[in-house]
A protein has these predicted regions:
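Charged, compositionally biased N-terminal leader segments and the immediate start
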Residues: 1-22
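Short hinge/gating elements
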Residues: 9-12, 28-32, 77, 105-109, ...
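Interdomain "pre-motor" coupling segment immediately N-terminal to P-loop NTPase/helicase cores
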Residues: 19-71
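Extended interfacial segments that mediate partner engagement and assembly in macromolecular machines
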Residues: 55-110
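Conserved P-loop
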Residues: 86-164, 211-213
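Walker B motif beta-strand of ABC-family P-loop ATPases
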Residues: 167
Length: 255
């Protein structure tokens, strides 16, 4: 057996076992451990730990990509002082994701620009980091996709996909009224997810104005009954979060 044969065989096995980090790092780590007098058991432990850490990072990246977030935003970058009515401790408690494990819902209410989407994205990011499947969409886009899927006779498959997320974030509910068919399709999806998965909705409308979006008091009442059975309400009333930060940035750039 040539001197290169064991190295070639090892590389082949590591590729077959799908251990790219071990393949990439084993030479460097072996030299480092030899210099430090580290035995083979500790060398293997370090190498496997590197693989595990890298694998988890890649899995988180895949979950974030699959979620289709419009932007990746964390709760760490959210200025809670700009929205004093928002309960910071409630949001940080929700970041533990136990409410998702319990299949509960969340609704963020407040005027446009108060940071509802940022908080929703932050909670979605944390869920991805904790190994949970997340989907993000706007209410208008979701309804449009469902109507298109219905016309193409793949609605059941699409609904199954949406119902399968541990957390489904529906942004901007109430920005535009829904058609009768669109409202019924959205109600059907939320009903399918009821006590099977968590749904986080952001809306610029208080509950008593949701009928304007759904066009039916009966449908709105039934929807709210399902959403609010187990729910966390995030009150986000106040001056526009985006406007306040825009003013702050301009103030910093002034001579």
């Amino acid at each position: 057996m040539s001197d290169q044969a064991p190295e070639i065989l090892l590389a082949h096995h590591l590729k077959a076992l799908k251990l790219p980090t071990c393949l990439r790092e084993h030479h460097k780590l072996a030299r480092q451990c030899a210099a430090e007098g580290v035995d083979h058991i500790r060398f293997l432990a370090r190498l496997v730990e590197m693989e595990m850490i890298d694998r988890e990072r890649r899995m988180v990246e895949r979950r974030i990509k699959a979620a289709r977030f419009p932007a990746v935003k964390s709760l760490d970058s959210f200025d809670f002082s700009a929205i004093p009515k928002l309960n910071k401790m409630q949001v940080l408690e929700m970041a533990r994701c136990e409410w998702i494990e319990r299949r509960e819902n969340a609704i963020a209410l407040g005027p446009s620009g108060t940071g509802k989407t940022h908080v929703a994205l932050g909670l979605g990011l944390v869920a991805c980091q904790k190994g949970l499947s997340v989907g993000f969409t706007t209410a208008a886009a979701l309804v449009s996709e469902m109507m298109e899927a219905r016309d193409e006779r793949r609605l059941l498959r699409f609904q199954k996909q949406m119902a399968g997320y541990k957390l489904l974030i529906i942004d901007e509910l109430g920005f535009v009224p829904l058609s009768k068919t669109g409202a019924e399709l959205l109600f059907e999806l939320i009903s399918q997810r009821y006590e099977r998965g968590s749904t986080l909705i952001t809306s610029n409308l208080p509950f008593d104005e949701w009928t304007e979006t759904f066009g039916s008091e009966r449908l709105t009442g039934a929807l709210l009954d399902r959403l609010t059975h187990h729910v966390s309400i995030l009150e986000m009333n106040g001056e526009s979060y985006r406007l306040a930060h825009s003013r702050a940035r301009k103030a910093k750039t002034r001579p």
